[in-house]
Curated annotation (Swiss-Prot):
It comes from Vibrio vulnificus (strain YJ016). Its main location: cytoplasm. Residues 1-28 are annotated as: Disordered. It catalyses: adenosine(1618) in 23S rRNA + S-adenosyl-L-methionine = N(6)-methyladenosine(1618) in 23S rRNA + S-adenosyl-L-homocysteine + H(+). Its EC number is 2.1.1.181. It comes from the Bacteria. Keywords: Cytoplasm, Methyltransferase, rRNA processing, S-adenosyl-L-methionine, Transferase. GO terms for cellular component: cytoplasm. Coiled coil: none annotated. This is Ribosomal RNA large subunit methyltransferase F. Specifically methylates the adenine in position 1618 of 23S rRNA. Belongs to the methyltransferase superfamily. METTL16/RlmF family. The keyword Iron-sulfur does not apply. Pfam families: Methyltransf_10 (PF05971).
């Protein structure tokens, strides 16, 4: 069974979703409001993450023999690849998906984001943990309906969630080429068939509107938002990462000159590549998050938990304050650290614990 690409249609004008708050709560300060706020910090990869420790290149090259020419020795004599080589990084991803997720047919068009899989997997596992906290006993993951905003050409979040938890996913994107690429991946891998539906968001000013229909319900949404405010800013950010990577290689005794690889603002290269819609939007990440929060209110009763990665730590507090103004009943900030790298996601629900329990009983 394969999925047809669907072009999103504008929703009919709908009545404003009633806020799940009382008049009294609107008069309370943020610290006194009825919003349940919890921040947690998780060190290291989730115990269910398949990518613990160093990559097993013997296993990976067995799964994908074409990775072998890209395997090198680092100064410690350990097997690795050059992470500044876009082809090597893509081959590593292909091998990881084949070896650990039974996704043997995966590819992305040139210039599109090639995501680091271990960190992406942790986002999914922490969200699964959030859902499991809603029930006593075993959570019915096979009944989960999830929505990925900005699925990209790589479809990485649906792949991980479908293969590890059998969630059913809807992926949306404003870029037709990304939708086409994700559809090819879904159609060419039996493990994904019938589990992933792709929708083109043809209203770029909207996030959920035009994607969530009147009869749609989702247990969770995921998103890796664009975090730059312009193409030029995105290009500078990419170059900075390349320079840092080259400097790190020099420190480890590998000959490479920082800044020796330059990019143009229109053509980011290497594993830090990406199309405009993947990298930047007007106003940057903070503006995108505010739009997402505001638009989520309209679908307060149709989504159990909204969530998004937040790249810049300084954007967490404004997002929290905005959500509290909207009458959100529960907010979770989950910080995930792997070595020196720290990432985080914010999840929110317009329902309290009791209401979420009833929602799950109705929809599984």
């Amino acid at each position: 069974m394969t999925n047809k690409r669907k072009s999103a249609k504008p929703l009919e004008p709908a009545k404003r979703t009633p806020k799940l708050r009382t008049k009294k709560s609107r008069d309370l300060s943020a610290s006194e409001s009825s919003c349940d706020f919890v921040k947690v910090t998780r060190a290291g990869l989730h115990s269910r993450n398949k990518h613990q420790g160093r990559y097993d290149f013997a296993k990976l090259t067995q799964a994908l023999p074409s990775l072998a020419p890209f395997v090198i020795k680092n100064p410690k004599g350990e097997a690795s690849i050059s992470f500044s080589d876009s082809t090597a990084v893509k081959m590593l991803n292909k091998a990881l998906l084949s070896a650990h997720y039974q996704v043997a047919n995966w590819d992305i068009p040139a210039g599109y984001l090639c995501p680091p899989i271990p960190g992406r997997a942790d986002y999914i596992h922490r969200l699964a943990e959030l859902l499991e906290g809603e029930v006593k006993g075993t959570f019915p993951h096979e009944k989960v309906q999830a929505l990925d905003i900005g699925v990209g050409a790589n479809a990485i979040y649906p792949i991980i969630a479908i293969c590890d938890y059998r969630w059913r996913y809807t992926g949306s994107d404003v870029d037709p080429k990304s939708i086409e690429s994700a559809q090819r991946i879904a159609d060419s891998n039996p493990v994904l068939q019938g589990q992933l539906e792709l929708k083109l968001q043809d209203q770029s000013q909207h996030i959920f509107q035009g994607i969530i229909g009147p009869t749609d319900y989702f247990h969770v949404t995921t998103c890796n938002p664009p975090f730059h405010a312009s193409a030029q800013e995105a290009a500078f950010g990419t170059q900075r990462k390349l320079d840092n990577l080259a400097a790190n290689r020099l420190k480890k005794g590998v000959t490479a000159k920082a800044g020796s690889q330059k990019i143009s603002k229109n053509k980011p290269i290497l594993n830090f590549g990406g199309q405009n819609s993947e990298l930047w939007c007007q106003g940057g990440e903070s503006s995108f998050l505010k739009r997402m929060a505001n638009e989520s209110e309209r679908f307060a009763h149709q989504v159990l938990w909204f969530s998004t990665l937040v790249s810049k730590k300084d954007n967490v507090r404004p997002l929290r304050k905005q959500l509290e103004k909207l009458g959100v009943r529960s907010i979770r900030v989950v910080e995930m650290s792997q070595g020196q790298k720290v990432s985080r996601f914010v999840a929110w629900s317009f329902m309290d614990k009791l209401q979420r329990g009833e929602w799950i009983k109705l929809r599984g």
